[in-house]
């Protein structure tokens, strides 16, 4: 099953939609298992320090996916999307990500929100934007969730990932792609 629409992806094994990987696993299901195993292993380690900027975001991606992909932490080089929604074209990723993270910094990384509801609303804006940019070929969702956890702590709250309902969260992310942030804000609020 094809998970993403992609244009001429040199990162895949020829004739497949399976990303080339350090373990040389040509089967998507096996790669998914290996990727999650490596992610979980790296999650037990200290996270990279940073300033909650795009360089820090890329360092987080590199940390979690370095054992799986040579390009971990590097921005996407091909056009890709899901369903009928295309993500930011690769030639604009750096500019758009830097714009987004500058705006996040101007908002003090959401640390000065007056309530959990206000934080959830701001976090939903950020997640919708970074998801539309989709800077990496794979691993965007997990990197987003790690970064959301960091933002939540920076704002003085805790994110309870045990309350994450994947289907509801994914549906909310999809709706956010067309500008409807309310379901995503509600999902974030439910977890803090």
From Swiss-Prot:
Segment forming the signal sequence: none
Catalysed reaction, written as an equation: L-tyrosyl-[protein] + ATP = O-(5'-adenylyl)-L-tyrosyl-[protein] + diphosphate; L-threonyl-[protein] + ATP = 3-O-(5'-adenylyl)-L-threonyl-[protein] + diphosphate
Residue ranges of every copy of the Fido domain listed in the record: 52-190
EC number: 2.7.7.108
Source taxon at top rank: Bacteria
One record GO biological process: regulation of cell division
Pfam families in UniProt: Fic (PF02661)
Keyword Nucleotide-binding listed: yes
Entry's Gene Ontology molecular function annotations: AMPylase activity; ATP binding
Binding residues annotated for ATP, in chain numbering: 82-83, 139-141
Entry keyword set: ATP-binding, Nucleotide-binding, Nucleotidyltransferase, Plasmid, Transferase
Family named by the database record: Belongs to the fic family.
Biological role stated in the UniProt entry: Probable adenylyltransferase that mediates the addition of adenosine 5'-monophosphate (AMP) to specific residues of target proteins.
PANTHER family with a match to the protein in the record: PROTEIN ADENYLYLTRANSFERASE FIC-RELATED
The name this protein goes by in its record: Probable protein adenylyltransferase y4lH
């Amino acid at each position: 099953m094809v998970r993403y629409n992609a244009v001429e992806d040199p990162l895949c094994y020829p004739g497949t939609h399976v990303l080339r990987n350090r373990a040389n696993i040509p089967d998507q299901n096996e790669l998914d298992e290996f990727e999650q195993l490596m992610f979980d292993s790296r999650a037990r380690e200290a996270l990279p320090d940073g300033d909650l900027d795009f360089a820090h975001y890329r360092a987080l991606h590199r940390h979690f996916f370095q054992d799986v992909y040579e390009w971990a932490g590097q921005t996407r080089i091909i056009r890709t999307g899901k369903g009928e929604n295309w993500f930011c074209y690769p030639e604009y990723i750096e500019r758009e990500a830097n714009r987004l993270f500058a705006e996040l910094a101007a908002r003090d990384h959401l640390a000065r929100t007056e309530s959990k509801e206000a934080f959830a609303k701001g976090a939903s804006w950020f997640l919708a934007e970074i998801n539309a940019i989709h800077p990496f070929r794979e691993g965007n969702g997990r990197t987003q969730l790690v970064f959301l956890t960091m933002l939540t702590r920076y704002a003085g709250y805790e994110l309870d990932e045990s309350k994450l309902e994947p289907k509801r969260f994914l549906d909310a992310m999809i709706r956010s792609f067309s500008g409807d942030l309310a379901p995503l804000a509600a999902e974030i609020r439910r977890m803090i």
